[in-house]
């Protein structure tokens, strides 16, 4: 909590802890994870297991480029006002390179992932999957391909007077 209010970039600290030049006498990963856990708990009501899972998921967003797979997290509730949006606000401060959208097209999502490698935070995705089936299937396809290194999503792009298939790398948390 102190790190967030003091303007310290917790994500940067997590990333530094995972590099070879990490100096344990100057940084304690367990302490950072504890502080991250406490920061989330300060703003969102979750049980201990949920807090642990989200804390570790946040850490994973800072290390995904060193892995073959990246986990996704889905936050759902049957009740309005349960704190999903508040959790999203907290995640936007703690994850690596956040990209938050409540209304995104497949075209935008593919290009943002390929260009920026963001942590994708999709608000109200349950409404998307209940709505336009074609749009939902495109987003689902991107997510299904993007959890693994080398995952691609193909789109047609204009080239001159015709269209050519282009494979986009969509590996991103």
Residue spans of the language-model regions?
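Replication-associated primase and helicase/ATPase modules
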Residues: 1-46, 129-132
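Conserved NTP-binding/hydrolysis core of motor NTPases
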Residues: 62-173
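Pre-Walker A (pre-P-loop) alpha-helix and adjacent loop at the N terminus of AAA/AAA+ ATPase modules
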Residues: 32-71
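Alpha-helical structural motif
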Residues: 29-32, 36, 54, 87, ...
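General structural signal for secondary-structure boundaries
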Residues: 1-2, 47-48, 101-107
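Short, mixed-charge, low-aromatic patches
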Residues: 12-17, 43-49, 65, 95-98, ...
């Amino acid at each position: 909590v102190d790190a967030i209010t003091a303007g310290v970039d917790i994500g940067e600290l997590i990333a530094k802890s995972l590099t070879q030049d990490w100096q344990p006498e100057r940084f304690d990963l367990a302490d950072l994870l504890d502080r991250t856990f406490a920061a989330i708990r300060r703003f969102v009501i979750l049980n201990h297991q949920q807090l642990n899972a989200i804390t570790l998921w946040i850490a994973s967003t800072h290390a995904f480029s060193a892995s073959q797979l990246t986990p996704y997290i889905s936050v759902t509730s049957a009740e309005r006002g349960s704190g999903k949006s508040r959790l999203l606000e907290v995640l936007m401060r703690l994850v690596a390179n956040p990209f938050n959208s409540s209304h995104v097209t497949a075209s935008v999502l593919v290009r943002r992932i390929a260009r920026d490698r963001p942590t994708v935070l999709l608000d109200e995705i349950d409404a998307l999957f209940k709505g336009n089936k074609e749009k939902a299937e495109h987003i689902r396809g991107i997510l299904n391909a993007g959890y693994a290194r080398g995952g691609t999503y193909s789109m047609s792009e204009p080239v001159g007077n015709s269209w050519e298939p282009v494979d986009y790398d969509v590996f991103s948390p």
